[in-house]
From Swiss-Prot:
Species: Archaeoglobus fulgidus (strain ATCC 49558 / DSM 4304 / JCM 9628 / NBRC 100126 / VC-16)
Main localization category: membrane
Protein name per the record: Uncharacterized protein AF_0148
Protein location: Cell membrane
Membrane topology: Multi-pass membrane protein
Amino acid sequence: MEAARGWDEEVMKWLAVAICLAMVGMAVMPAFQPLNLAFELYYGHHESLPITAASAAYEGIVITATLAAAAATAELVHLLLQQFL
């Protein structure tokens, strides 16, 4: 019984981490959208837009949030498989 309680707490912890990362990503990423739109309107819609600090930061946040959420999800799946297999 004690092992099941520890397992439940571990699953809930990683689920909370994944949810928090998703919420932070959704809250922060739109803040960079107006800057990206302004640069796109200024330079026109070209394939070779200059890399700006705003666009680099936006892409960095997207990549970091995606990787962190994937890692938390992988840990959650690992715990579920470990419990049931």
